[in-house]
């Protein structure tokens, strides 16, 4: 069986590339197709496969400014020659599923998320743009929406990385999706006997992560909050935390320190809405519970009352009610049980489920 894997771009190792690595292990002879490829920025496993790029990589500054060429990516995808492949697996977050396959080929799309900058986060991405940029972007985004919707029909079977994304696939493409949560690597994480008095926020300091909500809540409750990460909201958050010694914003940290902070925290605070969210599972693998806003992909990974606590409104007051319930001992979180739950999302489990599903849809 001849297999092709289509991935949006290869210029780093993020969650999508971890899924790609699993696909590479499951299909060691597969060819990879992508828009942009920087071998030095991806793993040896990915580099061991034959990688073909679209014409985007050949355009001026294509490797660095590839997102500026987004309007050309539909044409670039449709020019990729996938004749001769029996199975095509597209890995979609940026444009990937719009390839044209043989009528006899099976096309499975693993969807991390429909393109957020085209659909639900369009206004978030462009609200700070000038009038001219918004004027130019509007017709281009409209065109991309129409193209993206139409290419949903080119996919034979959708897989969503969470129940939340499955609902978005149904909403946007009017298609059902099998839910297979993405792989998480837990080898580095362990339970510690030394738990400190701080709560932890970890991730990019961008608007949708709602780190500001955690800062506001912990200014009010006076408990120690350690924040690890960086991003466009960093200066704003530091200004917000001025004069509050219990808010400790540390910026980027080495992985070894992140591992230590996970295992030593009282609980992870997760105030945003994400497509899935690896961070809560890493905290649970370290034996620590999660206090999360009860919406989005976290509903697949955190079990309310057993591995964490949900707060139901995205407000500081609602978050602090959940923190108060944790402090009052209303929940009996067992570190070993938290870790055991996290391990059900391990890479080996993901690969078993993914292979079984793909095998089931092949003729």
Model regions and ranges:
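Active-site donor-binding segments of glycosyltransferases and PAPS-dependent sulfotransferases
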Residues: 29-97
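A charged, aromatic-enriched C-terminal amphipathic alpha-helix characteristic of glycosyltransferases
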Residues: 314-317, 331-361
């Amino acid at each position: 069986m001849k297999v092709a894997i289509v991935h949006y771009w290869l210029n780093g190792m993020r969650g999508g590339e971890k899924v790609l690595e699993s696909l590479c292990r499951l299909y060691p002879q597969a060819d990879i197709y992508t828009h942009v490829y920087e071998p030095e920025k991806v793993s040896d496993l990915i580099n061991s496969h034959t990688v073909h790029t679209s014409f985007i990589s050949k355009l001026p500054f294509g490797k660095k400014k590839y997102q500026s060429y987004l309007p050309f990516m539909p044409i670039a995808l449709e020019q990729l020659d996938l004749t001769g492949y029996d199975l095509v697996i597209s890995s979609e977050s940026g444009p990937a599923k719009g390839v044209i396959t043989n009528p006899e080929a099976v096309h499975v799309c693993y969807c991390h998320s429909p393109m957020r900058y085209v659909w639900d986060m369009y206004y978030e991405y462009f609200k700070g743009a000038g009038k001219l940029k918004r004027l130019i972007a509007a017709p281009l985004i409209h065109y991309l929406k129409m193209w993206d919707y139409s290419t949903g029909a080119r996919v034979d079977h959708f897989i969503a990385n969470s129940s939340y994304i499955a609902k978005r696939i149904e909403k946007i493409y009017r298609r059902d999706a099998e839910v297979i949560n993405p792989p998480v690597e837990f080898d580095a994480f362990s339970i510690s006997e030394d738990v400190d008095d701080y709560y932890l926020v970890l991730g990019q300091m961008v608007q949708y992560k709602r780190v500001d909500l955690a800062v506001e809540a912990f200014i009010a409750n006076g408990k120690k909050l350690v924040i690890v990460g960086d991003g466009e909201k960093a200066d704003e958050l530091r200004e917000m935390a001025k004069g509050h010694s219990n808010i400790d914003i540390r910026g980027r940290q080495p992985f070894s320190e992140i591992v230590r902070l996970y295992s030593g925290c009282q609980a992870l605070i997760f105030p945003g809405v994400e497509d899935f969210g690896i961070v809560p599972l890493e905290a649970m693998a370290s034996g620590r519970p999660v206090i999360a806003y009860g919406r989005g992909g976290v509903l697949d990974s955190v079990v309310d009352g057993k591995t964490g606590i949900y707060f139901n409104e995205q407000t500081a007051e609602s978050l602090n009610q959940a923190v108060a319930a944790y402090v009052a001992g209303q929940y009996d979180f067992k570190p070993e049980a938290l870790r055991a739950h996290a391990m059900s999302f391990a890479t080996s489990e993901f690969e078993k489920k993914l292979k079984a599903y793909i095998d089931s849809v092949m003729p």
